[in-house]
């Protein structure tokens, strides 16, 4: 079945992509967001959800999660004209009659214009690399934590030895029934003070061990099998939830297949954020131009220009004068 034709497809559901989608809704066009991860929000939501951000206009400070929640709430005003596709990675797109055919790892989409807001490329969590892992993912196996309360009264196992793993273990100590940290080395990579707190806590530390297998029923993991490094000792850990904190990897390999002009790992754009292909625009960290400052605030400023230019491209005969939001929303 041929996909519905959208006015603008935004590649990337991070802060810049979300704001671009909102502004496109404000301008009355239909929008599709294609995001490679299983949730919206990009790096602030995934990599530093609880850390404070201080350079967002009108907010003295807010966390990555709060920023994401606000952007999603803002976009919800136009949910009737916005479609969101998660866990889809754009492989290629080609010019066709009336717009572009966009091929992802799951489907083919059609759009009249494209705005690329994928940051430094698609990024994905580093996994355990175990059979059946994907089956448990997003059920009771997590690569990121947003709501600590969801683990209340549970037996939680955390794999990893960096700052996030240690911070989550400490935060869950008084919430979960038990917390166990599994790390492949005796030494942790986290901040020294945090490691000292961890060692003085009630968190159970198992080092040096590596995950070997997952056991469960249906979509729920029940046991993690671990083996001591360079030894035959094997343990089975009962669990209610498993948190894998191995970090995230980024990749822009597909970006290089999009037949655009590039500057290092970013896309070269004009002052109006037009790429080397007519009808395709790029904003945020994905865009490269002289004097570029890689800040979220910068991307927010780029988004309206790119959206307006995309609308001018799609509807050249329409009266495309920009109107302030105070005149558009009661």
UniProtKB/Swiss-Prot annotation:
Q: Record keywords: Transport included?
A: no
Could you tell me the superkingdom of the organism this chain comes from?
Answer: Bacteria
Q: Which reaction does it catalyse?
A: 2 reduced [2Fe-2S]-[ferredoxin] + NADP(+) + H(+) = 2 oxidized [2Fe-2S]-[ferredoxin] + NADPH
Q: Report the cofactors.
A: FAD
What cystine linkages occur within this chain?
A: none
* Any one Pfam family match given in the protein's UniProt record, by short name: Pyr_redox_2
Q: How is the cofactor bound?
A: Binds 1 FAD per subunit.
Q: Which UniProt keywords apply?
A: FAD, Flavoprotein, NADP, Oxidoreductase
Task: Establish whether keyword Flavoprotein is in the entry.
Answer: yes
EC number(s) reported in the record = 1.18.1.2
Residues reported to bind FAD: 35, 43, 48, 90, 123, 285, 326
Entry-linked InterPro entries: FAD/NAD-bd_sf, FAD/NAD-binding_dom, Fd--NADP_Rdtase_type_2, Ferredoxin-NADP_redctase_2
Q: Which GO terms describe its molecular function?
A: ferredoxin-NADP+ reductase activity; flavin adenine dinucleotide binding; NADP binding
Matching PANTHER family, A to Z? THIOREDOXIN REDUCTASE 1-RELATED-RELATED
What does the annotation say about its assembly with partners? Homodimer.
Q: Which family does it belong to?
A: Belongs to the ferredoxin--NADP reductase type 2 family.
Matching entries from HAMAP family are given as: FENR2 (MF_01685)
Q: Which protein are we looking at?
A: Ferredoxin--NADP reductase
Q: What organism is listed for this UniProt entry?
A: Streptococcus pyogenes serotype M4 (strain MGAS10750)
């Amino acid at each position: 079945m041929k996909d519905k034709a959208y006015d603008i497809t935004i590649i990337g559901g991070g802060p810049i992509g979300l704001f671009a989608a909102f502004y496109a809704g404000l301008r009355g066009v239909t929008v599709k967001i294609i995001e490679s991860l299983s949730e919206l929000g990009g790096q602030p939501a995934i990599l530093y959800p609880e850390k404070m951000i201080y350079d967002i206009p009108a907010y003295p400070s807010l966390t990555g999660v709060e920023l994401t929640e606000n952007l999603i709430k803002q976009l919800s005003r136009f949910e009737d004209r916005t479609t969101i596709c998660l866990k889809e990675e754009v492989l290629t797109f080609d010019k066709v009659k009336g717009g572009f055919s966009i091929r992802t790892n799951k489907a083919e989409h059609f759009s009249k214009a494209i705005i690329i807001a994928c940051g430094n490329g698609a990024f994905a969590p580093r996994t355990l690399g175990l059979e059946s892992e994907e089956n448990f993912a997003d059920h009771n196996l997590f690569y990121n934590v947003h709501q600590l309360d969801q683990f209340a009264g549970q037996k939680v196992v955390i794999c990893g030895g960096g700052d996030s793993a240690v911070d989550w273990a400490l935060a869950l100590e008084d919430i979960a029934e038990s917390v166990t940290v599994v790390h492949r080395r005796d030494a942790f990579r986290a901040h020294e003070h945090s490691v000292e707190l961890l060692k003085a806590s009630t968190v159970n530390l198992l080092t040096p061990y590596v995950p070997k297998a997952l056991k469960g029923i249906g979509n729920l993991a029940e046991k993690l099998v671990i083996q001591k490094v360079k030894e035959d000792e094997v343990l089975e850990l009962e669990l209610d939830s498993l948190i894998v904190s191995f970090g995230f990897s980024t990749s822009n390999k597909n970006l290089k297949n999009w037949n655009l002009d590039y500057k290092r790992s970013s896309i070269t754009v004009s002052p109006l954020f037009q790429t080397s292909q007519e009808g395709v625009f790029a904003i945020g960290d994905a865009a490269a131009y002289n004097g570029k400052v890689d800040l979220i605030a910068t991307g927010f400023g780029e988004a309206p220009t790119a959206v307006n230019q995309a609308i001018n491209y799609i509807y050249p005969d329409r009266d495309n004068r920009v109107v302030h939001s105070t005149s558009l929303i009661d």
